[in-house]
Amino acid sequence: MKKSLVILSLLASANAFAGSIDYLAQQDAEYFAHPAMIGKVGVSGAYYNPAGTVFLEDGLYVQLNSQTLFKTYEMDTKENFGGLSHESDHPSAFVPSIQIVKKEGDRSYFLHAGAAAGGGSVKYKNGISAFEVIGQEIHSGLQGLSPNNKVHYLGGSTVNGSSYYINTTFGIAQKINPKFSVAGGLRFMYAMRELNGTASYDLNLTGEEAIKKENVRVDIDSERTGWGVGGVLGFNYQPTEKLNIGFKYETEVELNLDADGKLDTTKTGKFNGKGEFIKDLIINKIDGNLEAHPVIAEWLEDDRRNLPAMMALGVSYELTDRITLLTSGNYYFIKDANRNGCYENYDNGYEISVGVDYKLNDKWTLMAGYQYTDTGANENTYKDTDYALDADMYGVGVKYTPDETKEFIVSYAYVDYKNGTAVNEKGHETTTFKKEVNAVGLSAAFKF
């Protein structure tokens, strides 16, 4: 659902909602009702099944979509690394997308624009888990200078993060014969990621218990941007009037992210009278530890983070005049996109979806569906700014078709993420990550 995950709303790849790694597959309201969209023929096919758009009736179709995501993300640091909890409940109030299809005879032209990945922002109160873990690592390092040295994490400001991968896809679909069609197009991607926050530490260089006061403050402020171009290929096969099979392949998109960021360490206090030499030695050690930490390092330097290729296959079957069954699967080639270690330790991700449409009458249709997402992430990949968690998604929706030229959808989905715990290079558990999302989708489609 992810295409995945997301980097979700920043701290989540994957996923702001669902998907694998930096992918978001929810591109319209109908997806929330039943995510098995690849085998359907409709305006949504501009994204999910482009080759299927040529099986629409002749005309110009425009579909407008809005998503509202109520997200709760939580990081619980293990006791030996600080034991604090950090939570973000900042919603993504409006995530829009649009699909346009022009069908003429045996050919159609399609366009989709929306958030292909990322999908929002997060705000963690009292910093993030990495600040505590870094504090413990600094503590261990300073004890190498003197066993009496101690470091205490005093807390942090609200950490703001955001991640948006804006995608525009357009192309052409062509019928080869009455049952088979092919499609091809280009995808343009622009990525924007931001992170800023503050951490405060007390350094006790005597080892004695003292009144906690800030004497080191660390500020990070970073923005990373990049763009890339990829392709999309697809086919649609309709062996009977009741059965439809759709296929889509999206190529890997090369994204070179340019970093505009800085890490500032502000020193206050007298450091227990240890003098300027010791102060500078300690502060330099703090700077070095922070800049070397994976969560911080990626925000301070240019990097290549490609969007993985993905392949999708789906089937829709009209069981009766009222009931249509749906199923589809997505596969993400994450390991192939690991050009410079950005997806180190990841496995490939996949999703399996099922759904059903039940037509009450000519105007009203009920929809329901389920999806399981395996993001390919694990305890060796989770970090504060990128934790793609496996998930179960349950969705329902209703479609209203007042006439042949208009269609409206309201949908709801609940995403139940499986908790994940990160381990460091020594095999010690550091942080447990949790997520929960409630999503509402609205769409309006018009035929001209």
Regions found by a protein language model. Give the residues of each.
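Residues that define the transmembrane beta-barrel architecture of outer-membrane proteins
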Residues: 44, 91-96, 164-168, 225-231, ...
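Repeated loop/turn-to-beta-strand initiation elements of outer-membrane beta-barrel proteins
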Residues: 60, 106-109, 179-182, 242-245, ...
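Structural signature of outer-membrane beta-barrel domains
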Residues: 69-73, 114-120, 189-194, 250-256, ...
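Solvent-exposed loop segments that connect transmembrane elements
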Residues: 125-155, 192-222, 257-300, 337, ...
